[in-house]
Amino acid sequence: MKLQFLGTGSGMPSKQRNVSGLALDLSNVTWLIDCGEGTQHQMLYTKIKPRKVTAVWVTHLHGDHVFGLPGFLSTRSALDGTAPLTVYGPKGLKKWLEATLRVTGSHLGYELTVTEYSDGDTFIQDDHLVTVRKLEHRFPSFGFRIDGPEKPGMLRVDLVRELGVPSGPIYRTIKESDRFEFEGKWYDSKEYVTEPIPGKIVAILGDTIPCENARKLADGADLLVHEATFMEAEQALARKYGHSTTREATALANACAVGKLIVTHISARYVGREEEFVQEVVSDFPSSLVATDFLEYTVGD
């Protein structure tokens, strides 16, 4: 899984950061996590192809997370996108999106499905398991835990050779079948293949203050994407507006033993104070990045 941040600011666009938008590359398809105003314009500076986007996951319905969605859906159609697309989001998304497309006379040349989720829902999309949890914000906001598919184990070539099996197509048969035959005898393939390799886990949180569901989503994740709208000195402001601070994000990363933390949704008040902001994050959780627009990160790097 590879992520590219299309917008890392909060509230409104700035010269330094666009509003929320994140692309998740799953090798042969792409997902968007939120689609704030200008997201499709940001995509012009990347290699992301709208027609390859198969799903959009909306964390909540604040404008800085959804105002770019109708435009993106229309542009995808104009660029000859014909494959079906599913938009997942909280209650109210379907009504708003259908009204916007209807009132603007927007016609989509592909099948659009809008699925409204609730706390605890799970979905299988493009062979990935997505778990949805409700967070704590001034407005209904959610986060996602994305479990990638496990990969087959490695062939134990040493054991296979002990049987006298020559290299060739039978090696693939052993890996992909429950049993295999060699010289008139049948063998259980699992005895000659290592355990399956677990898929990568990515947790992506919408706007939130610290809460138990955030912990459930992040627990043991290879990557946690967490908002950090404010630095710790503005903790009172963070609580007033339903957001998290840098140290609240790092505290969760530490508590959940995540592999990597990337903080995003950064307030424009910190323009010119970027080094100070970064230091506050990495001093508490060294395996951290502060997202900037167009940052790319491959899970496992």
UniProtKB/Swiss-Prot annotation:
<feature type="binding site">
    <location>
        <position position="64"/>
    </location>
    <ligand>
        <name>Zn(2+) 2</name>
    </ligand>
</feature>
<dbReference type="InterPro" id="IPR013471">
    <property type="entry name" value="RNase_Z/BN"/>
</dbReference>
<dbReference type="InterPro" id="IPR036866">
    <property type="entry name" value="RibonucZ/Hydroxyglut_hydro"/>
</dbReference>
<protein>
    <recommendedName>
        <fullName>Ribonuclease Z</fullName>
        <ecNumber>3.1.26.11</ecNumber>
    </recommendedName>
</protein>
<comment type="function">
    <text>Zinc phosphodiesterase, which displays some tRNA 3'-processing endonuclease activity. Probably involved in tRNA maturation, by removing a 3'-trailer from precursor tRNA.</text>
</comment>
<feature type="binding site">
    <location>
        <position position="65"/>
    </location>
    <ligand>
        <name>Zn(2+) 2</name>
    </ligand>
</feature>
<dbReference type="Pfam" id="PF00753">
    <property type="entry name" value="Lactamase_B"/>
</dbReference>
<dbReference type="GO" id="GO:0008270">
    <property type="term" value="F:zinc ion binding"/>
</dbReference>
<feature type="active site" description="Proton acceptor">
    <location>
        <position position="64"/>
    </location>
</feature>
<keyword id="KW-0378">Hydrolase</keyword>
<feature type="binding site">
    <location>
        <position position="60"/>
    </location>
    <ligand>
        <name>Zn(2+) 1</name>
    </ligand>
</feature>
<keyword id="KW-0255">Endonuclease</keyword>
<comment type="subunit">
    <text>Homodimer.</text>
</comment>
<keyword id="KW-0862">Zinc</keyword>
<feature type="binding site">
    <location>
        <position position="62"/>
    </location>
    <ligand>
        <name>Zn(2+) 1</name>
    </ligand>
</feature>
<feature type="binding site">
    <location>
        <position position="137"/>
    </location>
    <ligand>
        <name>Zn(2+) 1</name>
    </ligand>
</feature>
<feature type="binding site">
    <location>
        <position position="207"/>
    </location>
    <ligand>
        <name>Zn(2+) 2</name>
    </ligand>
</feature>
<dbReference type="InterPro" id="IPR001279">
    <property type="entry name" value="Metallo-B-lactamas"/>
</dbReference>
<keyword id="KW-0819">tRNA processing</keyword>
<feature type="binding site">
    <location>
        <position position="207"/>
    </location>
    <ligand>
        <name>Zn(2+) 1</name>
    </ligand>
</feature>
<dbReference type="GO" id="GO:0042781">
    <property type="term" value="F:3'-tRNA processing endoribonuclease activity"/>
</dbReference>
<keyword id="KW-0479">Metal-binding</keyword>
<feature type="binding site">
    <location>
        <position position="265"/>
    </location>
    <ligand>
        <name>Zn(2+) 2</name>
    </ligand>
</feature>
<comment type="similarity">
    <text>Belongs to the RNase Z family.</text>
</comment>
<keyword id="KW-0540">Nuclease</keyword>
